[in-house]
Amino acid sequence: MLNVARYDVFKLSEAVLAGQPARVQRMLDGLQAEGEAEVLVHWALAEDIRALKRVKDAMAAGKPLPMALRENRIWGPRERLFERVLPRLGDATTARLLHAAHVVDGIVKGLKAPDWPADGWQALQRLAMQLCRACMPTPPRPR
């Protein structure tokens, strides 16, 4: 039998970095319905957050963006997404995202965390949406 999964974590990563919340939600729902492992979805999201932090740190140390991206193995469509997102991503936001990824890592492995859903998929959705909002082309206006 062929594996004809409609969604994959790498496309999810691109949708999150592109700041497309509706697409991200649809993909998360699809990955869950297809039985994808929560830890794999978490890995993809956390790896993007860690890569954003590494590239920001390299740029802060004086490295040009193209070199920082290459050293972190970011190329192709992700390279363009990183180039667009990085200037808008502040240090405080990056720190919050790293902490959230750490919390969700525990949740998908069965640990509880205060102020976070106990269900792994709900926690992944929250993490994905936090990252997605940080990557949106224009920040949402407060209501």
Regions found by a protein language model. Give the residues of each.
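Small-residue-rich helix-loop
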Residues: M1-L97, M136
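Charge-biased C-terminal accessory regions appended to nucleic-acid-, cytoskeletal NTPase
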Residues: M67-R143
